[in-house]
């Protein structure tokens, strides 16, 4: 029983908590690429989705095919490995073929060990790339490291390219780490090995960025990352980097893993940081199944951002998980079919029906929550549960509009969805024209 005091407490405005993420961390905006395909990372711009190919970059046709597939899936930046001479020689041809296809997605060159030489000897490669990714832990050692790092930065400044300086747990600057470990050993209150390693990660990224600026690379050309494989360590490291700088930040686990493990790890780590306002671009590093679809990492990245309310990419399909009241698989099959249908149609819908990505669809499985959830969606259908009347009421904008019956429910509901989209979003295209 609720008392008067309980009721007052429930409606006390002072107890209400705001919904939504913390304000975005202020960061320097970095323009990656030029022309129609360019994107801004940081500076208040929408959080950018990026991905990476796993083809042999020297295989021009395969790389072009995969870059185009990733871009069609929604990747706004695509990184390619540039690890040897044939790969560097192929880059301008890859760019040319993509441009001819109308695929303007900016390409990021991933350099390790010999990036200084490849960028020097293949100037067409240096020009064709929109951004360079370098790892301060494997540019070189001592004087050689300084010289090789300087070469890459000077080339980036010459061509006005963005640079991601990416420290990695697995290839951390050993000189810096050893120095910090030695200092820690002599401390009156030494930190744990993990704490010192995290500090080394942060310092590696920040010191390298400061050196890049000294060499003439503008602040609005620098993006930082500090990647590890542990979710908790990643969260801590990025909090540290965010607190000490205003560089744009690239988020991602070094190796998230395969299947559901990789998806959960990335969602947990990135979700917490994004909720705290940290992060300007994300990549979900999933280990693909043999022959698996590389675009899955793009889909997961988009779903993280859309689920958290940062961006909208495709209409959301909400479906109940099922229980003993839903022994039929009809609602599961319909939810799957509608989700597939929407993703297949989105390339066309995106251009024809501006704003369609904000659509919410509900496919529910029984009378308990079905009608209510369906009313909250833009379009919803409540399928019959076990023992219920074999009919499926359809709700549009909160109002029941029709009831579907028989074997053609799925096809009829798809038609209703298509008609609603044309009616609600078709006018936006006409108005724009």
Swiss-Prot record:
Protein residues bound to [4Fe-4S] cluster: 320, 323, 366, 373
Transmembrane segments: none
Gene3D superfamilies assigned: Dihydropteroate synthase-like, Sulfite Reductase Hemoprotein, domain 1
First-tier enzyme category under EC: oxidoreductase
Known EC number: 1.17.7.3
Gene Ontology biological process terms from the UniProt entry: isopentenyl diphosphate biosynthetic process, methylerythritol 4-phosphate pathway; terpenoid biosynthetic process
Cofactor note: Binds 1 [4Fe-4S] cluster.
Catalysed reactions, as listed in the record: (2E)-4-hydroxy-3-methylbut-2-enyl diphosphate + oxidized [flavodoxin] + H2O + 2 H(+) = 2-C-methyl-D-erythritol 2,4-cyclic diphosphate + reduced [flavodoxin]
Annotated keywords: 4Fe-4S, Iron, Iron-sulfur, Isoprene biosynthesis, Metal-binding, Oxidoreductase
HAMAP family: IspG
Family: Belongs to the IspG family.
NCBIfam families: ispG_gcpE, PRK00366.1
Function comment: Converts 2C-methyl-D-erythritol 2,4-cyclodiphosphate (ME-2,4cPP) into 1-hydroxy-2-methyl-2-(E)-butenyl 4-diphosphate.
Protein name: 4-hydroxy-3-methylbut-2-en-1-yl diphosphate synthase (flavodoxin)
Record organism: Beijerinckia indica subsp. indica (strain ATCC 9039 / DSM 1715 / NCIMB 8712)
Taxonomic lineage from the root: Bacteria, Pseudomonadati, Pseudomonadota, Alphaproteobacteria, Hyphomicrobiales
């Amino acid at each position: 029983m609720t008392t008067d005091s309980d009721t007052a407490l429930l409606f006390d405005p002072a107890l209400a908590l705001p919904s939504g993420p913390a304000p975005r961390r202020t960061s320097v905006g970095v323009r990656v690429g030029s022309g129609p395909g360019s994107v801004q990372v940081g500076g208040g711009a929408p959080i950018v989705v990026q991905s990476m190919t796993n083809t042999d970059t020297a295989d021009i046709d395969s790389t072009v095919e995969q870059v185009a597939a990733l871009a069609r899936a929604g990747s706004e930046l695509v990184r390619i490995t540039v690890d040897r001479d044939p790969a560097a020689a192929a880059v301008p041809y890859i760019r040319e073929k993509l441009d001819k296809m109308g695929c303007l997605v900016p390409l990021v060159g991933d350099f390790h060990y010999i990036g200084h030489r490849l960028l020097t000897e293949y100037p067409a490669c240096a020009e064709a790339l929109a951004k360079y990714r370098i790892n301060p832990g494997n540019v070189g050692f001592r004087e050689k490291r300084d010289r090789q790092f300087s070469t890459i930065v000077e080339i980036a400044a010459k061509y006005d390219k963005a640079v991601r300086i990416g420290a990695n747990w697995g290839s951390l600057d050993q000189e810096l780490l050893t120095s910090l470990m030695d200092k820690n050993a002599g401390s009156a209150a030494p930190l744990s090995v993990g704490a010192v390693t995290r500090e080394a990660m942060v310092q590696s990224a920040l010191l390298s960025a400061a050196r890049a600026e000294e060499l003439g690379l503008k602040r609005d050309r620098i993006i930082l990352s500090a990647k590890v494989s542990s979710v908790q360590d990643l969260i801590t490291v990025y909090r540290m980097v965010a607190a000490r700088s205003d560089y744009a930040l690239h988020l991602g686990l070094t190796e998230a893993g395969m299947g559901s493990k990789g998806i959960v790890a990335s969602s947990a780590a990135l979700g917490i940081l994004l909720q705290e306002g940290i992060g300007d671009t994300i990549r979900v590093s999933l280990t693909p199944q043999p022959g698996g679809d590389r675009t899955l990492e793009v889909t997961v990245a988009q779903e993280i951002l859309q689920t958290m309310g940062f961006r909208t990419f495709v209409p959301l399909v909400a479906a109940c998980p099922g229980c003993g009241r839903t022994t039929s698989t009809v609602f599961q099959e319909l939810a799957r079919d509608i989700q597939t249908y929407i993703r297949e149609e989105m390339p066309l819908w995106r251009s024809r029906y501006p704003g369609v990505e904000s659509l919410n669809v509900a496919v529910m499985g029984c009378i308990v929550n079905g009608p209510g959830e369906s009313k909250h969606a833009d379009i919803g259908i409540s399928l019959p549960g076990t023992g219920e009347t074999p009919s499926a009421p359809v709700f549009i904008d909160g109002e029941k509009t029709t009831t579907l019956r028989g074997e053609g429910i799925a096809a009829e509901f798809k038609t209703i969805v298509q008609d609603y989209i044309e009616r609600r979003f078709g006018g936006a295209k006409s108005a724009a024209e």
